[in-house]
Amino acid sequence: MLHLTNLQTKGYDELIEINGEVVYQVFAIKKNNGTYSTYYYTVPKNKLDQAEDYEIEEFNEFNELELAIKHIQSKGANLLRFNIFKGNKPL
């Protein structure tokens, strides 16, 4: 199970091939005073320079960690890859 302390953001980014197309993805979960925010971002790698036209960016909020985890996993996240974000955080 994923463990988060208050105001901590965990997740990862990756380049992955999906249906023959390489895409850049970001997955994240943040705990904030009993609520859990999720972040999902994806854009085709060959469209990174035009991301605003091709990206999908989603922010969601949940009252339970289990619901946040189920949601982010439904987007393709692998919880085993989640780690503390360093530098620029998506949430």
Please give the residue ranges for each predicted region.
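Mixed-charge, Lys/Arg-enriched low-complexity segments
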Residues: 1-7, 47-91
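Negatively charged, low-complexity tracts enriched in Asp/Glu with abundant Ser/Thr
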Residues: 1-22
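Generic "edge-of-domain/loop-turn" microfeature
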Residues: 14-17, 23, 33, 45, ...
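Short, exposed beta-strand/loop patches in secreted or surface proteins that constitute
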Residues: 16, 28-29, 59-62
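Intrinsic-disorder/low-complexity loop/linker signature
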Residues: 20-21, 34, 49, 88
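Generic low-polarity alpha-helical segments
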Residues: 24, 36-38, 68, 72
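Short aromatic-glycine-(Arg/Gly/Cys) micro-motifs in beta-strand/loop hairpins
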Residues: 26-56
